[in-house]
């Protein structure tokens, strides 16, 4: 999700917010424009767009909790066919924690999950029911993985697009939750 700013097509105006208090976050800097004091919530250096605003995290979360965020892009450990998301804890393992994810799933109008389709050991992360503690309940409608773009509709993942070189059959094999292949599945375009 932190890479989103690098992939916004030219001519499209988007105002990205970082939870730590930057509205108007730009893409990752090159060596000439790097500023070690300009970071996102993940502590990665970023740039600021013209007209950006910098404020404290309390103000940032007031915007998020107040419903002033149109869209959020989150990573996840698991998503299920009911639109539930687990993104903050794996029992018995050290992970960074939830950060602002619970605020974002409750306060943003739309949520897109961006994640790998399978875990490091090859197990599907798209499940009939999440097995990990939930971050949000019934709030996810769209999931983008390294294999596919899926929507969650009526208790099923609906396959809408496949990544270049990926077949619908591969997505079927690697999805544990109920999956419906749309009649008009197409290949993702990156231009």
Briefly describe each language-model feature range.
Residues 1-19, 23:
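N-terminal low-complexity or amphipathic/hydrophobic leaders
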């Amino acid at each position: 999700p932190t890479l989103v700013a690098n992939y916004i097509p030219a001519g499209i105006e988007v105002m990205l917010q970082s939870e730590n208090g930057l509205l108007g976050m730009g893409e990752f800097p090159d060596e000439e424009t790097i500023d070690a004091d300009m970071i996102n919530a993940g502590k990665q250096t970023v740039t600021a767009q013209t007209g950006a605003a910098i404020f404290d995290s309390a103000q940032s979360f007031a915007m998020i909790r107040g419903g002033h965020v149109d869209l959020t892009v989150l990573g996840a450990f698991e998503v299920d066919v009911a639109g539930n998301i687990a993104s903050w804890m794996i029992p018995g393992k050290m992970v960074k924690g939830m950060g602002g994810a619970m605020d974002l799933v409750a306060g943003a109008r739309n949520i897109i999950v961006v994640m790998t389709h399978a875990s490091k050991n090859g197990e599907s992360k798209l499940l009939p029911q999440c097995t990990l503690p939930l971050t949000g309940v019934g709030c996810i409608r769209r999931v983008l993985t390294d294999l596919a773009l899926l929507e969650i509709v009526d208790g099923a993942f609906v396959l809408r697009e496949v990544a270049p070189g990926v077949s619908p059959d591969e997505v079927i094999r690697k999805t544990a939750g109920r999956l419906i292949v749309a009649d008009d599945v197409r290949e993702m375009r990156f231009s």
